[in-house]
């Protein structure tokens, strides 16, 4: 079946449809990773978006149950140059096309993805429509122009869990086997789910955390009632400045000067907003597996997926230290409080997909919780 991509500026790209038949409208973005398409498609941070893969081949390894970051795809549509008709991988349980059709996700193949990406790079991420049901370009453009911008949208509460639960890992996805052989103290961590990836939960667990997951709209009383050793603020989709409940929660928790806190991606931005900072929308975002980030004399190659960033000039330098920058455009990639055990990174140390350079941030979180526990013991003995 024939298909179309219609952008808000009126540009039309033609290709062949796959997956579910229908129309999807959302923000058109691109990911530059050469692998990990299943993790990307199921990452809740992509909610509401039409994802263009720059690597020309897609679907070569099929799909499986182990590489899901959520139960279902988060993206509204998938765009690619070439789709593999037959996967080749020992873990594959089906084709990407069948899986997308099963979950109602529209796909478009055979389009000039290089031209799409150049247009997004030069003009910025914009709304668009992918259609495989015969809807005319004129009608699609009308629907696209009526669709809301990603700016101002609180998507975190839409994708967050609706109930509290304790994480129990169904897979053995910890890539560092040394962690499994070491005796570790267990730490109780409360994770606020703004769209959390399973890989993050697995890395926290592998590093010695018993994780209690709470909905995005939780208040400080619900968090502190669980007597956490530390609090984790997760990744998630949408505009961070629109997540009012999350910002309010972070402000409340920051009033405890001894409570360790760690934020990733959206959670990092929420920390910055709670500290009086502001965010802005990036032109076309950072979405890929090889973004260099520098800080403290160390360069990490990182996995990233975000369309907003903290404004460094909005942060109080007397209280907040910017610890990392994205070395491609110098945007803020990490922060820490000078007088509290609180820090965040804009990228994904859990990878999935991507490099493992930044996994040490989980160990840092553990060390902060261990220091607090030891300080409490000394105080009780004195």
UniProtKB/Swiss-Prot annotation:
- Pfam families, alphabetically? CPSase_sm_chain, GATase
Pathway of action:
Amino-acid biosynthesis; L-arginine biosynthesis; carbamoyl phosphate from bicarbonate: step 1/1; Pyrimidine metabolism; UMP biosynthesis via de novo pathway; (S)-dihydroorotate from bicarbonate: step 1/3
Q: Provide the residue span(s) of the region labelled CPSase.
A: 1-184
Where, in this chain's numbering, is L-glutamine bound? Answer: 45, 236, 238, 266, 269, 305, 307-308
InterPro entries in UniProt: Anth_synth/Amidotransfase (IPR050472), CarbamoylP_synth_ssu (IPR006274), CarbamoylP_synth_ssu_N (IPR002474), CarbP_synth_ssu_N_sf (IPR036480), Class_I_gatase-like (IPR029062), CPSase_GATase1 (IPR035686), GATASE (IPR017926)
User: What region holds the Glutamine amidotransferase type-1 domain?
Assistant: 188-375
UniProt keywords (A-Z) are: Amino-acid biosynthesis, Arginine biosynthesis, ATP-binding, Glutamine amidotransferase, Ligase, Nucleotide-binding, Pyrimidine biosynthesis
This enzyme's EC code(s): 6.3.5.5
**The keyword Ligase is annotated on this UniProt entry:** yes
Q: Which Gene3D superfamilies match?
A: 3.40.50.880, Carbamoyl-phosphate synthase small subunit, N-terminal domain
The protein's annotated catalytic reaction(s) are: hydrogencarbonate + L-glutamine + 2 ATP + H2O = carbamoyl phosphate + L-glutamate + 2 ADP + phosphate + 2 H(+)
Q: What class of enzyme is it?
A: ligase
> Which Gene Ontology BP annotations are present?
'de novo' pyrimidine nucleobase biosynthetic process; 'de novo' UMP biosynthetic process; glutamine metabolic process; L-arginine biosynthetic process
Q: Name one GO molecular function term.
A: ATP binding
The catalytic residues are 265, 348, 350
Q: Does the keyword Nuclease apply?
A: no
Which domain of life, per UniProt? Answer: Bacteria
Subunit and partners: Composed of two chains; the small (or glutamine) chain promotes the hydrolysis of glutamine to ammonia, which is used by the large (or ammonia) chain to synthesize carbamoyl phosphate. Tetramer of heterodimers (alpha,beta)4.
Function of the molecule: Small subunit of the glutamine-dependent carbamoyl phosphate synthetase (CPSase). CPSase catalyzes the formation of carbamoyl phosphate from the ammonia moiety of glutamine, carbonate, and phosphate donated by ATP, constituting the first step of 2 biosynthetic pathways, one leading to arginine and/or urea and the other to pyrimidine nucleotides. The small subunit (glutamine amidotransferase) binds and cleaves glutamine to supply the large subunit with the substrate ammonia.
Protein name per UniProt:
Carbamoyl phosphate synthase small chain
């Amino acid at each position: 079946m024939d298909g179309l991509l219609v952008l808000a500026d009126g540009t039309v790209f033609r290709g062949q449809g796959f997956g579910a038949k229908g129309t999807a409208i959302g923000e058109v973005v691109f990911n530059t990773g050469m692998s990990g398409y299943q993790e990307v498609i199921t990452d809740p941070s992509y909610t509401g978006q039409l994802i263009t893969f720059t690597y020309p081949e897609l679907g070569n390894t099929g799909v499986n149950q182990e590489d899901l970051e959520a139960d279902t795809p988060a993206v509204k549509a998938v765009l690619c140059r070439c789709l593999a008709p037959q996967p080749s991988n020992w873990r594959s349980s089906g084709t990407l096309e069948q899986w997308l059709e099963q979950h109602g996700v529209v796909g478009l193949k055979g389009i000039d993805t290089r031209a799409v990406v150049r247009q997004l790079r030069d003009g910025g991420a914009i709304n668009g429509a992918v259609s495989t049901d015969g809807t005319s370009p004129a009608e699609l453009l009308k629907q696209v122009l009526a669709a809301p911008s990603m700016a101002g949208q609180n998507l975190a509460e839409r994708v967050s869990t609706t109930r509290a639960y304790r994480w129990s890992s169904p897979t053995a996805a910890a890539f560092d086997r040394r962690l499994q052989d070491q005796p570790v103290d267990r730490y109780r961590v409360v994770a606020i789910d703004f769209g959390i990836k399973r890989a993050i939960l697995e890395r926290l667990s592998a590093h010695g955390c018993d994780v209690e997951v709470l909905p995005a709209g939780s208040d400080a009383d619900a968090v502190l009632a669980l007597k956490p050793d530390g609090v984790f603020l997760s990744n998630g989709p949408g505009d961070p400045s629109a997540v009012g409940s999350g910002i309010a929660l972070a402000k409340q928790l920051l009033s405890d000067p001894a409570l360790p806190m760690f934020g990733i991606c959206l959670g990092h931005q929420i920390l910055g907003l709670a500290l009086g900072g502001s965010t802005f929308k990036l032109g076309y975002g950072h979405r890929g597996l090889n973004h260099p980030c520098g800080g403290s004399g160390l360069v990490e190659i990182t996995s990233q997926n975000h369309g907003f960033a903290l404004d460094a000039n909005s942060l109080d330098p007397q209280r907040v230290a910017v610890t990392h920058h994205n070395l491609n455009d110098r945007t803020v990639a990490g922060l820490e409080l000078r007088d509290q055990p609180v820090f965040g990174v804009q990228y994904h140390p859990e990878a999935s997909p991507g490099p493992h350079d930044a996994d040490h941030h989980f160990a840092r979180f553990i060390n902060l919780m261990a220091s607090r526990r030891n300080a409490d013991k000394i105080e009780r003995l004195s």
